[in-house]
Amino acid sequence: MSETAKKVIVGMSGGVDSSVSAWLLQQQGYQVEGLFMKNWEEDDGEEYCTAAADLADAQAVCDKLGIELHTVNFAAEYWDNVFELFLAEYKAGRTPNPDILCNKEIKFKAFLEFAAEDLCADYIATGHYVRRAXVDGKSRLLRGLDSNKDQSYFLYTLSHEQIAQSLFPVGELEKPQVRKIAEDLGLVTAKKKDSTGICFIGERKFRKFLGRYLPAQPGKIITVDGDEIGEHQGLMYHTLGQRKGLGIGGTKDGTEEPWYVVDKDVENNILIVAQGHEHPRLMSVGLIAQQLHWVDREPFTGTMRCTVKTRYRQTDIPCTVKALDADRIEVIFDEPVAAVTPGQSAVFYNGEVCLGGGIIEQRLPLPV
């Protein structure tokens, strides 16, 4: 079988990126089929029923392109492998990233296995803005060509074997080009806005949604000087560096600086705040990361120089990484960084290549 006749299953989300991905693969000569994944059981009425609309859009695109659309329900896998861990992290006072977990457990595990075993696919494809390239005989993950849309941060858990079985057609394009292709083709998704919110759970009100699964525990808001200035409705609703939603307007000592979350005392259910987004308590000189995933799957020992992102869309931070043991590293930044958040991911790069990453276990605060 020639390379161009190979079978690709495209994860069709009902969005513009996966729609255009399917068309691009058709142009490249692949045998293309679509798969719509239902990963959440809707139980709260019409207001949040986005899955049905997304499925209708995915079906309309597949009809237009003349390709078959399969559907699969991964709700049980999502609940067990993504959502329960997501809740446990919030309960522990950390701020997890469910999109990274979802890519790891659903899109590049459950989907990959289903496509290969049930649909006899040679590859899967998604609408992620990343690229792949072979380096030293292994498939590597590269940043997407569109630096504004690069999604390699969310895919750092992938192994070189998973990347070798995955295609990322829009990673070579910029977003406006993708929308233009969709418009020229007359696809219903051409002007559909990009999805935000929790992976697969959609745009629902986050605080209300989380409150259904984790009972909120109100507690004190205390300044770094120890003054009590308000009450929070639950530590889980707040993250380091947060400014909005604290409900403690006004100023102190005549300064006009707004209040920011600088720490959480989980044991005592206290939210600690300070004024100014560059307050020393918000700054870190480094971090400790665990649950490491290196794309080449080679164990990391010794030290290395590279860059790191501690959150999506952050400018790369030059740093030195040192192995502490098989599954923990210490990262020291060249310059202090604000709002390094336990539970989020630290993702490492060498130029365009995403090396891998890990979960931030603790931040190393600026010495006082």
UniProtKB/Swiss-Prot annotation:
Stretches for region Interaction with target base in tRNA: 97-99
The entry assigns this protein to a family as follows: Belongs to the MnmA/TRMU family.
**Recorded catalytic activity of this chain's protein:** S-sulfanyl-L-cysteinyl-[protein] + uridine(34) in tRNA + AH2 + ATP = 2-thiouridine(34) in tRNA + L-cysteinyl-[protein] + A + AMP + diphosphate + H(+)
- Organism of this sequence: Escherichia coli O6:H1 (strain CFT073 / ATCC 700928 / UPEC)
Coiled-coil spans in chain: none
* Subcellular location field: Cytoplasm
Which example biological process does GO assign this protein? tRNA wobble position uridine thiolation
Query: Mind telling me what this protein is named?
Result: tRNA-specific 2-thiouridylase MnmA
Function field: Catalyzes the 2-thiolation of uridine at the wobble position (U34) of tRNA(Lys), tRNA(Glu) and tRNA(Gln), leading to the formation of s(2)U34, the first step of tRNA-mnm(5)s(2)U34 synthesis. Sulfur is provided by IscS, via a sulfur-relay system. Binds ATP and its substrate tRNAs.
Q: What is its EC number?
A: 2.8.1.13
Which Cys residues form disulphide pairs?
A: 102-199
Q: Which Gene3D superfamilies match?
A: Adenine nucleotide alpha hydrolases-like domains, HUPs, Translation factors
PANTHER family in the cross-refs: MITOCHONDRIAL TRNA-SPECIFIC 2-THIOURIDYLASE 1, TRNA 5-METHYLAMINOMETHYL-2-THIOURIDYLATE -METHYLTRANSFERASE
Quaternary state and partners of this protein? Interacts with TusE.
